[in-house]
């Protein structure tokens, strides 16, 4: 089960059909990573800087907004609740401009990034970052989205 909650109405303007798009990307991740068979629960909250600032402060002790926060709940098993993914509308919009990528592409990237975090992937250590980025880039490529870690040629 995938549940998407819209905390901030601006998401509709930013990405069109945010619930449909988010569910599609999460389903895609579950399928590509061969996790669909477990029928896990994943919750996505499309929020804003204010909520992510509050959560980041409360749970990580970092007093600034961030693009995505993930909270992992249970290990992968049949019917498990994998966790929650929170995205900030303002961060996604601003970062897509800074990186010169389509908002929708960056939105998809951050959903994939959050999904990998709730599956236990991390990027704190160089080896972990290489593994996680390779998965992200591979999944994004299958969605027709270029590698976000390689600067765009001008």
UniProtKB/Swiss-Prot annotation:
What does the sequence similarity comment in the record state about its family? Belongs to the endoribonuclease YbeY family.
Q: What is the lineage of its organism?
A: Bacteria, Pseudomonadati, Pseudomonadota, Alphaproteobacteria, Rickettsiales
Q: Mainly resides where?
A: cytoplasm
State the organism named in the record.
Answer: Anaplasma marginale (strain Florida)
PANTHER family with a match to the protein in the record: ENDORIBONUCLEASE YBEY, CHLOROPLASTIC (PTHR46986:SF1)
Task: Please give the PROSITE patterns that the UniProt record associates with this protein.
Answer: UPF0054
Specify whether Nuclease is a keyword of the entry.
yes
What cofactors are annotated for this protein?
Answer: Zn(2+)
Which note does the record give on the cofactor? Binds 1 zinc ion.
Supply the Pfam families for this chain. Answer: YbeY
Q: HAMAP family in the record, alphabetically?
A: Endoribonucl_YbeY (MF_00009)
Binding, Zn(2+): 113, 117, 123
Gene3D superfamilies for this protein: Metalloproteases ('zincins'), catalytic domain (3.40.390.30)
The alphabetized list of GO BP terms reads:
rRNA processing
Protein name, UniProt field: Endoribonuclease YbeY
- GO terms for CC? cytoplasm
């Amino acid at each position: 089960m995938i549940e998407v909650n819209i905390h901030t109405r601006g998401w509709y303007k930013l990405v069109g059909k945010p619930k449909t798009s988010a569910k599609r990307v999460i389903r895609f991740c579950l399928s590509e990573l061969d996790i669909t068979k477990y029928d896990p629960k994943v919750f996505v909250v499309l929020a804003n800087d204010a909520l992510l600032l509050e959560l980041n402060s409360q749970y990580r002790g970092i007093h600034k907004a961030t693009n995505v926060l993930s909270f992992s709940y249970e290990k992968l098993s049949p019917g498990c609740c994998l966790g929650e993914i929170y995205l900030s509308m303002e961060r996604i919009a601003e970062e897509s401009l800074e990186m010169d990528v389509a908002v929708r592409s960056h939105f998809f990237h951050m959903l994939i990034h959050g999904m990998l975090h709730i599956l236990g992937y991390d990027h704190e250590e160089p080896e972990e970052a290489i593994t996680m980025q390779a998965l992200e880039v591979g999944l994004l490529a299958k969605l027709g989205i270029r590698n976000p870690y390689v600067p765009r040629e001008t």
